[in-house]
Amino acid sequence: MSSPNLAHPPTDYTGIVLFPRELSQFFMGDAGETLLINGAPGTGKTLFTIRGLDVLDRDSDVLYVSTRVDQETVHEMYFADHSSLDTTAILDLFQDPFELPLDVDVPFEKLDLDSLLEWIQEINAATTQLTIAFDSWELIYEYLAVRHDDPPDIKTVTNQLAVLAREENIRLMLVTETAAPSSLEYIVDGVVTLQVKEDDRGRTRRDLRLDKLRGVRIGNRLQPFTLADGQFQVITPVELLTIQTGTGNGTWDPLANSKAKFSTGIRDLDRILSGGYNRGSVVHLDLGPDLSRDAWSVLTLPTIRNFLSQEMGVAVVPPREGSPGLLHNDLNTVLSSQVFDTYCHVFETYAGPSDSADRYDQPDSTESFSEMATTTPPDDAPTATHETDGADDGSRSTDGVTGSDQPHPIDEDFESPIEGGQLAYEPYMAYVEQVREESEDPLLHVISMDTAQEAFETRLGDFANYVALHNDLTLLITKQGTELRTRADRVADMHFRLERSGDAIILYGENPLTPLLGIGISQSESIPKITLTEMV
């Protein structure tokens, strides 16, 4: 049987992987491995086991052994529509332990603890590679133990199974009914624990803990997962685009706004919000600790693109610690430079030197939110210059609007909202009013409250009223330690939080209340597509 490389388990490239990479590597070992699957009832152990069998079925014969109910019922409850396995892969010991999909000559009539190992050996002899799961192992042990006057304890039988698995190169999965550590963990080669809990607002949070995987380096022990659509799926780390010069080859297909709503630019989020953000509303995007410095862009960039693609004005005050050139490079990749120059207004302020430990970002690398792509150091960032001879070199007049995002050129009649390197409220409002006069459409304001704290600390209420009056949309960005965080929440119509869960990124709404949503970013196309998967 030809098989794919299990080190790279199947994924749909949207931040969801069907089986953890570490577990695929664990089962690739030369010797048979025994995995203990811990978890309280209702944590998703059976769906996890079925997912594992589904993946391992690609290069082995698999068998799911249970004492639950009959084959048809088990298949209908857990396998149908969620697995490629049919009823022949399911064995109910309560019925006939010898009704196997393989041609096996079993030299005994009754299955008990003494004959269990021989039974497994006979099945293995009829296959090239066997994977067998016992769900649950305690119930199967108890069912077979009652056939003995003085049965060996479960620890002894488990040890015999693990030894047999190593000798015969059999993959074993033993499902238990407890999350508490047990003596069995010292016998087996690998241990995972499935956990589920609810937060104070009733949202379900599920995590897979990789306790032990012999021979495998575990970089991230805690991995969030979901049982959405009745399937076990791991929510994986997502990658941000490497900061680079835009090519202009992408095409952003805008999502339509309605009379009452602005599209978020993310189809899944529009669906959750019944069409998007309300017109005239203030949205608070609350960033949790330990996120990368460009995490703010995950939700804001799609909305910015959607406004600009419909030739609607956008004013952005980005975080001071964001990657230089992020907006310019991203937007010029998916929109024409004329659209960016005409409708996008970026106001960056002077941050000055800082050695603060309370930053968005972690040390740079190239992998994910937790390991960001290397960006241009501040000293090497492009400086603002005036356009000369109409040259289209990406440098435009900033007239006090400083920074490397090469903002919209300031009209001679427009007064810069930057005073002494800092954003000022009245000049900002005067500036957007002049922008508004050039268009009949509402504006999008994207404002980092850390950057704009001095300008907005006494005017947030006034600004929220202004936004409502003009049917604009505002995204206020705060992070841990932002002084205006609580005040931003008070004036906001919606409140969303972005936080880390293991190495993955989770989004959820406080107002409106939403489930936890795993974020996936597909980079298989020229424009990244963001997907949201509900954690259930």
UniProtKB/Swiss-Prot annotation:
Keyword Membrane annotated: no
Positions with biased composition (Polar residues): 363-372
Inducing factors: Transcribed divergently from the gvpA gene. Maximally transcribed in late log phase, probably part of a gvpD1-gvpE1 operon. Gas vesicles appear earlier when grown in static culture, possibly due to O(2)-limitation.
Subcellular location, record wording: Cytoplasm
Pfam families on file: GvpD_bR2, GvpD_P-loop
Stated family: Belongs to the gas vesicle GvpD family.
The name this protein goes by in its record: Protein GvpD1
Taxon lineage: Archaea, Methanobacteriati, Methanobacteriota, Stenosarchaea group, Halobacteria
